[in-house]
C-alpha cells in the first residue's frame, strides 16, 4: 500500500516540475523545477530499489550519484545565472537572446 503512495507522490512531483519547466519565464524558477524533477527521479530510484531487491543498494547508490550530479548542476547553473544577471540585468528566459549583442 505504501508503494503506491510513494509512486503517486513521485509522479505528482515530476508533473509539477515539468509544468513549471514549461511555463516558467524566470531562469531561477526553471532551475528549481529541474531540481524538483531530479528529486522525484531519486524518489523512484529508492522506492524501486527497496521494492525489488532490498539487500542490494544499487538504487540507493545511484540516487546518491544523482544528488551529487544535481548539486553540481545547481552550482554551475547558478553561477551562469549570476553572470547573465550581471551582464544583462535580467534573468527572464524570453529576454536572454545571446545571438544579439
From Swiss-Prot:
It holds the Pfam family Oxidored_q2. Keywords: Chloroplast, Membrane, NAD, NADP, Plastid, Plastoquinone, Quinone, Thylakoid, Translocase, Transmembrane, Transmembrane helix, Transport. It is a multi-pass membrane protein. One of its GO terms (cellular component) is plastid. GO terms for biological process: ATP synthesis coupled electron transport; photosynthesis, light reaction. Its main location: plastid. It is found in: Plastid, Chloroplast thylakoid membrane. It catalyses: a plastoquinone + NADH + (n+1) H(+)(in) = a plastoquinol + NAD(+) + n H(+)(out); a plastoquinone + NADPH + (n+1) H(+)(in) = a plastoquinol + NADP(+) + n H(+)(out). It is an enzyme of class 7 (translocase). HAMAP family: NDH1_NuoK. NCBIfam families: PRK05715.1-2 (NF004320). NDH is composed of at least 16 different subunits, 5 of which are encoded in the nucleus. Belongs to the complex I subunit 4L family. NDH shuttles electrons from NAD(P)H:plastoquinone, via FMN and iron-sulfur (Fe-S) centers, to quinones in the photosynthetic chain and possibly in a chloroplast respiratory chain. The immediate electron acceptor for the enzyme in this species is believed to be plastoquinone. Couples the redox reaction to proton translocation, and thus conserves the redox energy in a proton gradient. This is NAD(P)H-quinone oxidoreductase subunit 4L, chloroplastic. The lineage of its organism: Eukaryota, Viridiplantae, Streptophyta, Embryophyta, Tracheophyta. The gene is ndhE.
Amino acid at each position: 500500500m505504501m508503494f503506491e503512495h510513494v509512486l503517486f507522490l513521485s509522479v505528482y512531483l515530476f508533473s509539477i516540475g515539468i509544468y513549471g519547466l514549461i511555463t516558467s519565464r524566470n531562469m531561477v524558477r526553471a532551475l528549481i523545477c529541474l531540481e524538483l524533477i531530479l528529486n522525484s527521479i531519486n524518489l523512484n530510484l529508492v522506492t524501486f530499489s527497496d521494492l525489488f531487491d532490498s539487500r542490494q543498494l544499487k538504487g540507493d547508490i545511484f540516487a546518491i550519484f544523482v544528488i551529487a550530479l544535481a548539486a553540481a548542476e545547481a552550482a554551475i547553473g547558478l553561477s551562469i545565472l549570476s553572470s547573465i544577471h550581471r551582464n544583462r540585468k535580467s534573468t527572464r528566459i524570453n529576454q536572454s537572446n545571446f545571438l544579439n549583442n
